[in-house]
Amino acid sequence: MLVPFVVFSFLGYCLNVFNLLTSGDTNWVHYALTPVKELVLGGSIAGNDVLWFLTSLFMVQIIFNELKTRNVKSWLIVIVAISIAVICHMFDITKPAYLANVSMGIALYSLGYMLRDIQYDKKVFGVAFAAYIAIMLIEPSHIDLRTNTLNENGYYILALLFSICGCITVNNIFKHIQHLPVLTYIGKNSMDFYVMHMLVLGVITILPWSEWMIPNYVVFGVMCIASLTVPAFIGYLLEHSRYSWVLGKTNK
């Protein structure tokens, strides 16, 4: 997990440096110090900032495993973790970002551990599905997990419930439908798509589409297709080479 983070963060950094240079930015701080600040406070750097999830997930797994080793009850972990996230939201504590998102991650990770079997009970699924739809239609509430920010007019507790019920709903739906090869492939190789898609989009946005008079919908189509095909192709090449470690995989 950390190896893909380091490798693809560096590639994102290179892409961001290229953008800064072509925009005429000559402030050395933006090249040397800003990335460090972004990493320390946000968990990732510009150019491939979606990788914050890997650092947060790494911390979540380490902390959760340590707590379970010490026989801390899962329900207690959930309560404490959610309390920290709620306090961060109430007092607008946004830095470092992982204080809140790791806490929320630990809570959701613990809930997943607690509900791993019972979530497929028909009654549990029915209640979760009903709550999910009700919140979506009556009082839409959702949280940006990276920044712990709530949507306008949303309610934090409802947003938590919405996320949990949404996970249960999606898990049940995909458990009972026929496996789709495309989705199965993406799921098995999710790391490839996750670490590469922003780089692919970043390269595409550099191209002078407006000068070429290419319509926006065509550019959007190119982005969608490239985000699916390029990571799959590069991932396949890496996986079947001595560089499979780049994606955190063992060589086949």
Segment roles from a protein language model:
Residues 1-252:
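Alpha-helical transmembrane segments and their immediate juxtamembrane cytosolic regions
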